[in-house]
A protein has these predicted regions:
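Short, acidic, Ser/Thr-enriched surface-loop or helix-capping motifs
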Residues: 20-21
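Conserved beta-strand and immediately adjacent loop positions that scaffold enzyme active sites
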Residues: 15-17, 85, 117, 169
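Electropositive phosphate-/nucleotide-binding environments in soluble metabolic enzymes
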Residues: 8-12, 39, 43, 66, ...
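PLP-dependent aminotransferase-class I/II
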Residues: 122-184
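Active-site-adjacent loop/helix segments that line or gate small-molecule/cofactor pockets in enzymes
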Residues: 1-17, 31, 55, 64, ...
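A generic fold-level signal
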Residues: 10-13, 113, 147
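Glycine-rich loop-to-alpha-helix module at the N-terminal edge of alpha/beta enzyme cores
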Residues: 25-113, 119, 126
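A generic secondary-structure signal marking the coil-to-beta-strand transition
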Residues: 6, 14-15, 25, 85, ...
C-alpha cells in the first residue's frame, strides 16, 4: 500500500499541538480523532492517569464493573434527565455498533420489529467497522466496501455554511426538517 508509506511521524503533543520527529508543530484540529479533547500532556490528566494505573489499568465490563465506571455512570445519570442506566464501550466504532443494536432491539421489544431503517447524515464518519461504515459512509474512505454495507436513509448535512442566498437561517432549518419528514 504505497499511499500509506510516507506519513509524518508524530512524536509528542503539548496542549492543542502535535510535534513531528523534525520538530514541526501541527495544530491538532481534530483532537487526535476526537479522543483527546482536553489537550496533550495536561499535568492534571497525566497525574490522574498515573494514580489510576497504580490501582487498576483495565478490567472488562462484561459481567464486571469497576469504581471509575460506577462513578462516571452516576455522574452521567445525574446530569441526563430520564436516563436510568448507561452502557460503556471502548471505542467509537463499537459505540456505533451497540447503538444500532440497542435501537433495533428497542423496536423489537415493543412489538415493532419491522422498524429497521436507520437515518444518517452524509459524510458522517463514525469508525471503521462495517456497521460504523454503513451509518457513517464517507466515499473517500469506504467505497471499496460499499457493496458489503447495509443501506441507510441518508440526508444532506444541514450546514448553514451553504445557506441559500434567498433563505433566512430559520427558513433553511425548516427546509432541512421538511426534507427529513418527507422521507418518512
Amino acid at each position: 500500500m504505497s499511499e500509506w508509506s510516507n506519513f509524518t511521524t508524530i512524536v509528542r503533543g503539548k496542549g492543542m499541538w502535535l510535534f513531528d520527529d523534525h520538530g514541526t508543530k501541527y495544530l491538532d484540529g481534530v483532537a487526535s480523532m476526537w479522543c483527546n479533547v482536553w489537550g496533550h500532556s495536561r499535568r492534571e490528566l497525566v497525574n490522574t492517569i498515573i494514580k489510576q494505573t497504580k490501582k487498576l489499568q483495565h478490567s472488562p465490563l462484561f459481567n464486571f464493573t469497576n469504581e471509575p465506571s460506577e462513578i462516571l455512570s452516576k455522574k452521567l445519570i445525574g446530569i441526563c434527565p430520564g436516563m436510568s442506566s448507561v452502557f460503556f464501550t471502548d471505542n467509537g466504532s463499537t459505540a456505533m455498533e451497540v447503538s444500532i443494536k440497542i435501537a433495533l432491539q428497542y423496536w423489537k421489544n415493543i412489538g415493532l420489529e419491522n422498524k429497521t431503517k436507520i437515518a444518517t447524515l452524509e459524510n458522517g464518519y463514525h469508525g471503521d467497522t462495517f456497521g460504523a461504515m454503513s451509518v457513517g459512509y464517507v466515499p473517500e474512505f469506504f467505497s471499496k466496501f460499499k457493496s458489503k454495507l447495509f443501506q441507510t436513509i441518508q440526508f444532506k448535512v444541514p450546514n448553514s455554511y451553504h445557506l441559500p442566498k434567498n433563505m433566512t437561517i430559520k427558513e433553511f432549518e425548516d427546509k432541512c426538517i421538511e426534507r427529513i419528514e418527507n422521507r418518512f
